[in-house]
From Swiss-Prot:
Subunit structure, as described in the record: Interacts with either IL11RA1 or IL11RA2 to associate with IL6ST, giving rise to a multimeric signaling complex.
Residues flagged as site, Important for interaction with IL6ST and for the stimulation of cell proliferation: 168
Chain's gene name: Il11
Listed name of the protein: Interleukin-11
One term of GO molecular function: interleukin-11 receptor binding
UniProtKB keywords: Cytokine, Growth factor, Secreted, Signal
Compartment(s) of residence: Secreted
GO BP, sorted A to Z: cell population proliferation; interleukin-11-mediated signaling pathway; negative regulation of hormone secretion; positive regulation of cell population proliferation; positive regulation of MAPK cascade; positive regulation of transcription by RNA polymerase II
PANTHER family: INTERLEUKIN 11, INTERLEUKIN-11
Residues covered by region (Important for interaction with IL11RA and for the stimulation of cell proliferation): 182-190
InterPro entries: 4_helix_cytokine-like_core (IPR009079), IL-11 (IPR020438), IL-11_mml (IPR020412)
Length: 199
């Protein structure tokens, strides 16, 4: 009996492809088929980034008080207002949000690189902010892929950002970047929550 079993095992080993059923490809992730779940994840990441931005903006005001509005011509303009919420469409919102956040990511990277000694004390917070921005952008890209939406390019060519003219210039730039990002994320949370009800 043992000889027969061994003989069978030897014969089977000669044709492994016919005996072993192929399994799923290695490393194939589970893909969610529910866009509402993907949108929920994007909303949570956006809210978390909004809270981080609000906290960092408050730190900036404490460390470097600066009255008045601050702006940078290179920052994107806020595309939507409260009056336009009712007419929002998911493709336009996701496309514009991704383009705007890519611009803010570039500005945060620039701030970390060229902000000078004054902003070095905020380097850990700026690094964490950049990491969360990158994570949210990956989530938005995934959501757009699941919904078969085009990956839009920026409306205008990217212009390299020059170094701030002075230490005060870098501080004003930081106020402008954080303030603009805060407004963009606040609008994004409202818009995404509204659009979720239409899926």
């Amino acid at each position: 009996m043992n000889c027969v079993c061994r003989l069978v095992l030897v014969v089977l080993s000669l044709w492994p492809d016919r005996v072993v059923a192929p399994g799923p490809p290695a490393g194939s992730p589970r893909v969610s088929s529910d866009p509402r779940a993907d949108l929920d994840s994007a909303v949570l990441l956006t809210r978390s980034l909004l809270a981080d931005t609000r906290q960092l903006a408050a730190q900036m005001r404490d460390k470097f008080p600066a009255d008045g509005d601050h702006s940078l011509d290179s920052l994107p303009t806020l595309a939507m207002s409260a009056g336009t919420l009712g007419s929002l469409q998911l493709p336009g919102v996701l496309t514009r949000l991704r383009v705007d956040l890519m611009s803010y990511l570039r500005h945060v990277q620039w701030l970390r690189r060229a902000g000078g000694p004054s902003l070095k004390t905020l380097e850990p917070e700026l690094g964490a902010l950049q990491a969360r921005l990158e994570r949210l952008l990956r989530r938005l890209q995934l959501l757009m892929s699941r919904l078969a939406l085009p990956q839009a390019a920026p409306d205008q060519p990217v212009i390299p950002l020059g170094p701030p003219a002075s230490a005060w210039g870098s501080i004003r730039a930081a106020h402008a970047i954080l303030g603009g990002l805060h407004l963009t994320l606040d609008w994004a949370v409202r818009g995404l929550l509204l659009l979720k009800t239409r899926l």
